[in-house]
């Protein structure tokens, strides 16, 4: 990532986004904030293409996501992904990485276990005619759990998803056993628009686990949820 370049921030680089709605901004600037109840400064970076971020960071994200799959408690995948499979899944359209830094660009060769706080992707939930309804997947670095990183990731999502042209958010599978996740969406006034009974066969549970379907209108987000102060 070139500190002097603006190309990596341009929404014109968005791939596989909403078909009928254009981004609301020409660029997405890195977003800086402090972790809740802490003086730790974090910065969220938009990722329109993996060519703009270090290979070492991609490799760390790849490893981190496969560990989450292997835990068998939050994502529906059964087997670890290949490197290309991960790239196709996480970076299909747009992703975000949040680092513990006050820099406005991503430096190479960092200790990602210490620096990476979390990541998420945003992509259409449906085929082109309904592609303005987005889905997202979130991942907090286990080394930083307990710092309310997940809530900050959710706030960045609410700030940036509308800028990409999305009008509505749908989360298809929030397992009822994933309390850390559903507490965030309830707190941010996402609506519980459905329940999938016996949705997942998860590790550590003897019976299939239900999943909540969440929805939220991205054109009417409460201002207090967007504030990162």
Curated annotation (Swiss-Prot):
Thermal behaviour (record text): Optimum temperature is 35 degrees Celsius.
Residues binding CoA: 145-150
Compartments where found: Cytoplasm; Mitochondrion
GO cellular component: cytosol; mitochondrion; nucleus
Signal peptide bounds: none
pH dependence: Optimum pH is 8.5-9 for azetidine-2-carboxylate and 6.5-7 for (S)-1-pyrroline-5-carboxylate.
Modification(s) after translation: Not glycosylated.
Residues the entry annotates as binding substrate: 135, 172-173
Pfam families for the chain: Acetyltransf_1 (PF00583)
Result of changing residue 149 to A: Abolishes acetyltransferase activity
Quaternary data: Homodimer.
Name under which the protein is recorded: N-acetyltransferase MPR1
Originating species: Saccharomyces cerevisiae
Origin organism lineage: Eukaryota, Fungi, Dikarya, Ascomycota, Saccharomycotina
């Amino acid at each position: 990532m070139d500190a002097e370049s603006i190309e990596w921030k341009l929404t014109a680089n968005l791939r596989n986004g909403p078909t009928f709605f254009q981004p609301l901004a020409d660029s997405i600037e890195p977003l800086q904030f402090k972790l809740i109840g802490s003086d730790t400064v974090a910065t969220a970076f938009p990722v329109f293409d993996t060519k703009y971020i270090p290979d070492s960071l991609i490799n760390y994200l790849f490893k981190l996501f496969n560990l989450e799959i292997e835990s068998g408690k939050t994502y529906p995948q059964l087997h670890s992904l290949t490197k290309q499979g991960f790239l196709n899944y996480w970076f299909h359209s747009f992703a975000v990485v949040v680092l513990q830094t006050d820099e406005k660009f991503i430096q190479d060769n960092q200790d990602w276990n210490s620096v990476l706080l979390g990541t998420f992707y945003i992509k259409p939930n449906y085929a082109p005619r309904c592609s303005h309804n987005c889905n997202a997947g979130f991942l907090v670095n286990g080394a930083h759990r307990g710092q309310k990183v997940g809530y900050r990731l959710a706030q960045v999502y609410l700030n940036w998803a509308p800028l990409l042209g999305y009008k509505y958010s749908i989360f298809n599978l929030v397992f009822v056993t994933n309390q850390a996740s559903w507490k965030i969406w309830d707190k941010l006034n996402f609506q519980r628009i459905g329940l999938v009974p016996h949705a997942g066969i998860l590790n550590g549970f003897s019976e299939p686990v239900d999943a909540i379907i969440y929805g939220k209108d991205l054109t009417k987000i409460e201002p207090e949820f967007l504030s990162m102060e």
